[in-house]
Amino acid sequence: MNQLDNLKKFSKISADTGDVDLIRTYQIQHATTNPSLILKSPLFTTYLKLFNDAIDYAQKIGGNQNTKITNASDRLIVNIGSEILANISGYISTEIDAQLSFNTDLTIKKAHKLITMYQKKNIDTSRVLIKIAATWEGIQAAEELEKSGIKCNLTLVFSFAQARACAERNIYLISPFIGRIYDWYNQRNLIKTSYINDDPGIQSIKKIYHYYKTYGYNTIIMGASFRRLEQILALSGCDYLTISPHFLKQLYQNTNSVTRQLFPPKTIISHHIPVLDQSEFFQEHNKNQMAVEKLNEGIQQFSIDQQKLHKLLLNNLNVQLQK
């Protein structure tokens, strides 16, 4: 048995890719997408029909240039999400435009629009997770969406304050970014040993895991953003792990055994902990320089890739108009 199948015994695996062929190859149950991954996906081969449909859809709906770009982008991510769902048994995480990360109302509006678009394609939307950056505004939006039956994946989690606020508001799933935490400390020469348990990213997710399981929170933890295979193996037993094609291939080709590393406590503590309010959230989150920098950087990176996707769609909208 390969290492990937061994890992599946202890953690549910999500493919961190928009490439449905790779998802089929590794028989993955869940998948995550974002603008960066969509740009890397086979848009002009496997997904050419889906891409062209998004352009046609935007032209049919009409409106000004910005409206067409937005509609084409939304249609494309729903098209790709629907295609992936046809090849997996679990969830697809569909990301909200990162440029909305600090606007609760617009995030809620966009989420409902995407869910409606999935419904019109006869997709079971209980299998769609709306992916939102874990800003304070994003967490508030997700809380409202969860109340209306829309499951959310709060991404770009770097601080314990983010994780705690999500759990307290019954968010379905969070994605702590292990690799980006590691990067921040490693670039500053703040990691003293190569021992995996001294990895700040591993320490962060273990703290969240222990807290959630100790106090009986139902929010799922999905480890994301890995830099080394050792990081993935060190989190065997985490609820979910979303893994890039590079590491999926390594795990698939490796036959070494996998030992479970994370275990829930035998007893759950029934103890009322006051919910973090806005001022307490920012006070705790802002104590963590890494988390503040990495959250803002992540939003900026996703926003840049969203703009690249918009530019690609605009170019094709203009080409179609010239025909």
UniProtKB/Swiss-Prot annotation:
Looking at its record, which EC class is this enzyme?
transferase
Is the Transcription keyword given for this protein?
no
User: Can you tell me which residues form the catalytic site?
Assistant: K131 (schiff-base intermediate with substrate)
The metabolic or biological pathway listed in the UniProt record of this protein is: Carbohydrate degradation; pentose phosphate pathway; D-glyceraldehyde 3-phosphate and beta-D-fructose 6-phosphate from D-ribose 5-phosphate and D-xylulose 5-phosphate (non-oxidative stage): step 2/3
Q: Name one Pfam family in it.
A: TAL_FSA
Q: Which family does it belong to?
A: Belongs to the transaldolase family. Type 1 subfamily.
One GO term in the molecular function aspect is: transaldolase activity
Q: Which reaction does it catalyse?
A: D-sedoheptulose 7-phosphate + D-glyceraldehyde 3-phosphate = D-erythrose 4-phosphate + beta-D-fructose 6-phosphate
* Classification via NCBIfam families: PRK12346.1, talAB
Write down the superkingdom of origin. Bacteria
Database matches in InterPro entries: Aldolase_TIM, TAL/FSA, Transaldolase_1, Transaldolase_AS
The organism named in the record is Blochmanniella floridana
Q: How does it assemble?
A: Homodimer.
> PANTHER family given for it?
TRANSALDOLASE, TRANSALDOLASE A
Gene this protein is translated from: tal
Q: Give the keywords, sorted.
A: Cytoplasm, Pentose shunt, Schiff base, Transferase
Q: What is this protein called?
A: Transaldolase
Report the PROSITE patterns cross-referenced here. TRANSALDOLASE_1 (PS01054), TRANSALDOLASE_2 (PS00958)
Function text: Transaldolase is important for the balance of metabolites in the pentose-phosphate pathway.
Which EC number(s) are documented for this chain? 2.2.1.2
* Record flagged with keyword Cytoplasm: yes
Q: Name one GO biological process term.
A: carbohydrate metabolic process
Instruction: Name one cellular component (GO) term.
Output: cytosol
